[in-house]
Protein backbone atom coordinates (compact mmCIF):
# COMPACT_ATOMS: atom_id res chain seq x y z
CA UNK A 1 0.00 0.00 0.00
CA UNK A 2 2.85 2.35 0.80
CA UNK A 3 4.41 1.74 -2.61
CA UNK A 4 1.06 2.36 -4.32
CA UNK A 5 0.63 5.63 -2.43
CA UNK A 6 4.10 6.79 -3.43
CA UNK A 7 3.35 5.99 -7.07
CA UNK A 8 0.12 8.00 -6.98
CA UNK A 9 1.89 10.97 -5.42
CA UNK A 10 4.58 10.75 -8.10
CA UNK A 11 1.94 10.68 -10.82
CA UNK A 12 0.21 13.69 -9.32
CA UNK A 13 3.48 15.60 -9.23
CA UNK A 14 4.16 14.73 -12.85
CA UNK A 15 0.65 15.75 -13.88
CA UNK A 16 0.94 19.08 -12.09
CA UNK A 17 4.05 19.85 -14.12
CA UNK A 18 2.11 19.66 -17.39
CA UNK A 19 1.55 23.22 -18.62
CA UNK A 20 -2.04 24.44 -18.50
CA UNK A 21 -1.97 25.52 -22.10
CA UNK A 22 -3.01 23.85 -25.32
CA UNK A 23 -0.32 23.48 -27.91
CA UNK A 24 -0.72 25.05 -31.33
CA UNK A 25 -1.95 22.56 -33.92
CA UNK A 26 -1.42 22.90 -37.67
CA UNK A 27 -3.37 20.58 -39.98
CA UNK A 28 -3.55 17.86 -37.37
CA UNK A 29 0.06 18.20 -36.20
CA UNK A 30 0.52 19.34 -32.60
CA UNK A 31 3.51 21.63 -32.50
CA UNK A 32 6.09 20.97 -29.81
CA UNK A 33 8.52 23.29 -28.09
CA UNK A 34 12.26 23.21 -28.60
CA UNK A 35 15.02 23.78 -26.06
CA UNK A 36 14.65 27.56 -26.29
CA UNK A 37 10.86 27.46 -26.22
CA UNK A 38 10.43 27.81 -29.97
CA UNK A 39 7.69 25.85 -31.75
CA UNK A 40 8.98 22.85 -33.69
CA UNK A 41 7.31 20.23 -35.87
CA UNK A 42 7.45 16.81 -34.18
CA UNK A 43 8.95 13.70 -35.73
CA UNK A 44 6.57 11.43 -37.61
CA UNK A 45 6.60 8.84 -34.85
CA UNK A 46 7.35 9.08 -31.14
CA UNK A 47 8.66 5.82 -29.69
CA UNK A 48 9.06 5.05 -26.00
CA UNK A 49 10.82 1.89 -24.77
CA UNK A 50 12.43 0.92 -28.09
CA UNK A 51 14.39 -1.88 -26.44
CA UNK A 52 11.20 -3.89 -25.95
CA UNK A 53 11.10 -4.64 -29.69
CA UNK A 54 14.43 -6.49 -29.65
CA UNK A 55 14.18 -10.17 -30.51
CA UNK A 56 10.51 -10.04 -31.46
CA UNK A 57 9.44 -12.88 -33.77
CA UNK A 58 6.29 -14.70 -32.66
CA UNK A 59 3.58 -12.17 -31.86
CA UNK A 60 -0.12 -11.99 -31.04
CA UNK A 61 -2.50 -9.05 -31.37
CA UNK A 62 -4.59 -8.77 -28.21
CA UNK A 63 -6.34 -5.52 -29.14
CA UNK A 64 -7.09 -4.02 -32.55
CA UNK A 65 -9.52 -1.11 -32.41
CA UNK A 66 -10.50 1.22 -35.23
CA UNK A 67 -12.17 4.44 -34.04
CA UNK A 68 -14.31 6.69 -36.23
CA UNK A 69 -15.05 10.21 -34.92
CA UNK A 70 -18.60 11.37 -35.68
CA UNK A 71 -18.03 14.90 -34.42
CA UNK A 72 -15.22 17.14 -33.25
CA UNK A 73 -15.12 20.27 -31.10
CA UNK A 74 -12.13 22.55 -30.69
CA UNK A 75 -11.70 25.73 -28.67
CA UNK A 76 -8.88 28.24 -29.07
CA UNK A 77 -8.43 30.96 -26.45
CA UNK A 78 -6.00 33.71 -25.68
CA UNK A 79 -5.91 36.29 -22.92
CA UNK A 80 -3.49 38.81 -21.51
CA UNK A 81 -3.07 42.10 -19.73
CA UNK A 82 -0.84 45.14 -20.08
CA UNK A 83 -0.89 48.53 -18.39
CA UNK A 84 -4.05 47.72 -16.50
CA UNK A 85 -5.90 46.63 -19.65
CA UNK A 86 -7.15 43.09 -20.22
CA UNK A 87 -7.85 41.41 -23.55
CA UNK A 88 -9.21 38.02 -24.51
CA UNK A 89 -10.29 36.16 -27.63
CA UNK A 90 -11.97 32.83 -28.28
CA UNK A 91 -12.73 30.71 -31.33
CA UNK A 92 -15.00 27.66 -31.31
CA UNK A 93 -15.13 25.04 -34.06
CA UNK A 94 -17.67 22.21 -34.28
CA UNK A 95 -17.88 19.67 -37.08
CA UNK A 96 -19.96 16.55 -37.65
CA UNK A 97 -20.02 13.74 -40.20
CA UNK A 98 -22.84 11.40 -41.22
CA UNK A 99 -23.34 9.02 -44.13
CA UNK A 100 -20.90 6.24 -43.18
CA UNK A 101 -22.91 3.26 -41.93
CA UNK A 102 -21.87 0.42 -39.66
CA UNK A 103 -21.31 -2.03 -42.49
CA UNK A 104 -18.83 0.34 -44.12
CA UNK A 105 -16.96 0.89 -40.87
CA UNK A 106 -16.84 -2.86 -40.27
CA UNK A 107 -15.33 -3.47 -43.70
CA UNK A 108 -12.72 -0.78 -43.06
CA UNK A 109 -11.79 -2.36 -39.72
CA UNK A 110 -11.66 -5.85 -41.25
CA UNK A 111 -9.41 -4.75 -44.08
CA UNK A 112 -7.15 -2.79 -41.73
CA UNK A 113 -6.60 -5.88 -39.59
CA UNK A 114 -5.92 -8.12 -42.58
CA UNK A 115 -3.48 -5.57 -43.94
CA UNK A 116 -1.63 -5.30 -40.63
CA UNK A 117 -1.30 -9.09 -40.27
CA UNK A 118 -0.08 -9.37 -43.87
CA UNK A 119 2.51 -6.65 -43.29
CA UNK A 120 3.76 -8.28 -40.10
CA UNK A 121 4.03 -11.62 -41.89
CA UNK A 122 5.88 -10.07 -44.82
CA UNK A 123 8.29 -8.49 -42.34
CA UNK A 124 9.16 -11.92 -40.92
CA UNK A 125 6.89 -12.07 -37.88
CA UNK A 126 4.81 -15.14 -37.06
CA UNK A 127 1.33 -13.93 -36.07
CA UNK A 128 -0.62 -16.01 -33.57
CA UNK A 129 -4.34 -15.46 -34.17
CA UNK A 130 -6.87 -14.94 -31.36
CA UNK A 131 -8.18 -18.56 -31.11
CA UNK A 132 -4.64 -19.93 -30.79
CA UNK A 133 -3.74 -17.23 -28.26
CA UNK A 134 -6.77 -18.23 -26.16
CA UNK A 135 -5.58 -21.85 -26.28
CA UNK A 136 -2.06 -20.91 -25.19
CA UNK A 137 -3.26 -18.44 -22.55
CA UNK A 138 -6.86 -19.37 -21.54
CA UNK A 139 -7.21 -16.13 -19.57
CA UNK A 140 -7.48 -14.22 -22.86
CA UNK A 141 -10.86 -15.85 -23.53
CA UNK A 142 -12.18 -14.64 -20.16
CA UNK A 143 -11.66 -10.91 -20.77
CA UNK A 144 -14.84 -8.85 -20.75
CA UNK A 145 -15.40 -7.28 -24.19
CA UNK A 146 -17.34 -4.15 -25.05
CA UNK A 147 -20.19 -4.21 -27.57
CA UNK A 148 -18.91 -3.54 -31.05
CA UNK A 149 -19.64 0.03 -32.21
CA UNK A 150 -19.39 1.33 -28.64
CA UNK A 151 -18.93 5.06 -28.19
CA UNK A 152 -15.60 6.20 -26.77
CA UNK A 153 -13.14 9.04 -26.76
CA UNK A 154 -12.73 9.07 -30.53
CA UNK A 155 -16.31 8.31 -31.53
CA UNK A 156 -17.44 4.87 -32.70
CA UNK A 157 -15.05 2.00 -31.90
CA UNK A 158 -15.03 -1.08 -34.12
CA UNK A 159 -13.20 -4.40 -33.76
CA UNK A 160 -12.53 -6.58 -36.83
CA UNK A 161 -14.96 -9.43 -37.51
CA UNK A 162 -14.19 -12.40 -35.29
CA UNK A 163 -12.37 -10.28 -32.73
CA UNK A 164 -13.55 -8.55 -29.56
CA UNK A 165 -13.52 -4.87 -28.69
CA UNK A 166 -11.51 -4.05 -25.57
CA UNK A 167 -11.01 -0.59 -24.08
CA UNK A 168 -7.51 0.85 -23.96
CA UNK A 169 -6.28 3.65 -21.64
CA UNK A 170 -8.16 6.88 -22.32
CA UNK A 171 -10.83 5.31 -24.53
CA UNK A 172 -13.62 6.15 -22.10
CA UNK A 173 -12.36 9.65 -21.28
CA UNK A 174 -13.95 12.75 -22.76
CA UNK A 175 -11.67 14.66 -25.11
CA UNK A 176 -10.43 18.06 -24.03
CA UNK A 177 -12.09 20.53 -26.41
CA UNK A 178 -9.10 22.86 -26.22
CA UNK A 179 -6.93 20.23 -27.87
CA UNK A 180 -4.72 20.53 -24.81
CA UNK A 181 -1.65 18.39 -24.54
CA UNK A 182 -3.09 18.20 -21.57
CA UNK A 183 -4.47 19.70 -18.38
CA UNK A 184 -3.14 18.22 -15.15
CA UNK A 185 -6.23 16.26 -14.10
CA UNK A 186 -6.62 14.73 -17.57
CA UNK A 187 -2.95 13.76 -17.46
CA UNK A 188 -3.37 12.05 -14.11
CA UNK A 189 -6.51 10.24 -15.26
CA UNK A 190 -4.79 8.97 -18.39
CA UNK A 191 -1.76 7.70 -16.50
CA UNK A 192 -3.88 5.86 -13.93
CA UNK A 193 -6.46 4.45 -16.39
CA UNK A 194 -5.86 0.69 -16.54
CA UNK A 195 -8.56 -1.20 -18.47
CA UNK A 196 -8.48 -4.98 -18.20
CA UNK A 197 -6.85 -5.51 -21.60
CA UNK A 198 -4.05 -3.06 -20.82
CA UNK A 199 -3.35 -4.52 -17.41
CA UNK A 200 -3.40 -8.16 -18.51
CA UNK A 201 -1.88 -8.11 -22.01
CA UNK A 202 1.73 -8.50 -20.73
CA UNK A 203 0.71 -11.50 -18.58
CA UNK A 204 -1.11 -13.17 -21.48
CA UNK A 205 2.05 -12.75 -23.55
CA UNK A 206 4.15 -14.24 -20.76
CA UNK A 207 1.90 -17.30 -20.40
CA UNK A 208 1.71 -17.87 -24.16
CA UNK A 209 5.37 -16.92 -24.65
CA UNK A 210 4.60 -14.54 -27.49
CA UNK A 211 5.14 -10.84 -28.01
CA UNK A 212 1.86 -8.97 -27.63
CA UNK A 213 0.61 -6.06 -29.73
CA UNK A 214 -2.26 -3.62 -29.18
CA UNK A 215 -3.26 -1.20 -31.94
CA UNK A 216 -5.62 1.77 -32.02
CA UNK A 217 -6.34 3.39 -35.39
CA UNK A 218 -8.31 6.64 -35.45
CA UNK A 219 -9.88 7.27 -38.87
CA UNK A 220 -11.09 10.88 -38.91
CA UNK A 221 -12.82 12.92 -41.61
CA UNK A 222 -10.38 15.83 -41.60
CA UNK A 223 -7.53 17.60 -39.86
CA UNK A 224 -7.71 20.60 -37.58
CA UNK A 225 -5.70 23.70 -36.83
CA UNK A 226 -5.91 25.75 -33.66
CA UNK A 227 -3.92 28.54 -32.10
CA UNK A 228 -4.30 26.69 -28.80
CA UNK A 229 -4.76 28.26 -25.39
CA UNK A 230 -2.47 30.94 -24.06
CA UNK A 231 -2.59 33.30 -21.11
CA UNK A 232 0.32 35.45 -22.23
CA UNK A 233 -0.94 37.19 -25.32
CA UNK A 234 -2.34 40.69 -24.84
CA UNK A 235 -4.35 41.58 -27.90
CA UNK A 236 -3.73 38.14 -29.36
CA UNK A 237 -6.08 36.39 -31.75
CA UNK A 238 -7.62 32.94 -31.37
CA UNK A 239 -8.30 30.74 -34.38
CA UNK A 240 -9.52 27.24 -35.19
CA UNK A 241 -9.84 25.72 -38.66
CA UNK A 242 -10.87 22.49 -40.40
CA UNK A 243 -9.60 20.83 -43.59
CA UNK A 244 -11.72 17.87 -44.80
CA UNK A 245 -10.04 14.66 -45.89
CA UNK A 246 -10.15 11.08 -44.66
CA UNK A 247 -7.25 10.84 -42.23
CA UNK A 248 -5.45 8.45 -39.92
CA UNK A 249 -5.29 10.88 -37.02
CA UNK A 250 -2.17 11.78 -35.10
CA UNK A 251 -1.60 12.90 -31.54
CA UNK A 252 1.15 13.68 -29.09
CA UNK A 253 2.00 12.97 -25.48
CA UNK A 254 -1.07 12.17 -23.44
CA UNK A 255 -3.50 13.35 -26.13
CA UNK A 256 -2.48 10.50 -28.42
CA UNK A 257 -4.69 8.97 -31.10
CA UNK A 258 -3.22 6.30 -33.42
CA UNK A 259 -0.86 4.07 -31.45
CA UNK A 260 0.86 0.70 -31.17
CA UNK A 261 1.85 -0.90 -27.87
CA UNK A 262 4.17 -3.90 -27.68
CA UNK A 263 5.41 -6.19 -24.90
CA UNK A 264 7.95 -8.97 -25.36
CA UNK A 265 7.11 -12.37 -23.78
CA UNK A 266 9.16 -11.81 -20.62
CA UNK A 267 8.58 -8.06 -20.38
CA UNK A 268 8.04 -7.77 -16.66
CA UNK A 269 5.30 -5.31 -17.62
CA UNK A 270 7.66 -2.91 -19.40
CA UNK A 271 6.76 -2.41 -23.04
CA UNK A 272 7.12 -0.09 -26.02
CA UNK A 273 4.74 2.60 -27.25
CA UNK A 274 4.73 4.10 -30.74
CA UNK A 275 2.58 7.20 -31.30
CA UNK A 276 1.80 8.62 -34.74
CA UNK A 277 2.52 12.37 -34.58
CA UNK A 278 2.02 13.33 -38.24
CA UNK A 279 -1.41 12.43 -39.66
CA UNK A 280 -1.86 10.54 -42.92
CA UNK A 281 -4.50 12.39 -44.94
CA UNK A 282 -6.15 11.65 -48.27
CA UNK A 283 -7.07 14.46 -50.64
CA UNK A 284 -9.63 12.27 -52.40
CA UNK A 285 -13.13 13.76 -52.51
CA UNK A 286 -15.64 11.95 -50.29
CA UNK A 287 -18.24 14.60 -49.38
CA UNK A 288 -21.72 14.59 -50.95
CA UNK A 289 -23.02 17.56 -48.98
CA UNK A 290 -21.64 20.14 -46.58
CA UNK A 291 -23.49 22.82 -44.70
CA UNK A 292 -23.92 24.70 -41.45
CA UNK A 293 -26.53 23.54 -38.95
CA UNK A 294 -27.11 25.59 -35.83
CA UNK A 295 -24.00 25.53 -33.67
CA UNK A 296 -22.17 23.24 -36.12
CA UNK A 297 -19.66 24.98 -38.38
CA UNK A 298 -19.33 22.09 -40.83
CA UNK A 299 -21.98 19.37 -41.15
CA UNK A 300 -20.51 16.85 -43.58
CA UNK A 301 -22.43 14.10 -45.35
CA UNK A 302 -20.02 11.48 -46.68
CA UNK A 303 -20.29 9.14 -49.65
CA UNK A 304 -19.66 5.78 -47.93
CA UNK A 305 -18.02 4.19 -50.97
CA UNK A 306 -15.58 7.07 -51.42
CA UNK A 307 -14.95 7.27 -47.67
CA UNK A 308 -14.10 3.56 -47.55
CA UNK A 309 -11.72 3.83 -50.49
CA UNK A 310 -9.93 6.82 -48.98
CA UNK A 311 -9.78 5.14 -45.56
CA UNK A 312 -8.20 2.03 -47.04
CA UNK A 313 -5.63 4.21 -48.79
CA UNK A 314 -4.51 6.12 -45.69
CA UNK A 315 -4.56 3.01 -43.49
CA UNK A 316 -2.34 1.22 -46.02
CA UNK A 317 0.08 4.13 -45.69
CA UNK A 318 -0.07 4.40 -41.90
CA UNK A 319 0.27 0.78 -40.76
CA UNK A 320 3.67 0.15 -42.42
CA UNK A 321 5.07 3.01 -40.34
CA UNK A 322 4.42 0.99 -37.18
CA UNK A 323 5.82 -2.22 -38.67
CA UNK A 324 8.92 -0.26 -39.69
CA UNK A 325 9.36 0.97 -36.11
CA UNK A 326 9.24 -2.63 -34.90
CA UNK A 327 11.81 -3.74 -37.48
CA UNK A 328 14.15 -0.80 -36.95
CA UNK A 329 14.38 -1.63 -33.26
CA UNK A 330 14.34 -5.40 -33.68
List PLM regions with ranges.
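Bacterial N-terminal signal peptides that target proteins for export
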Residues: 1-8
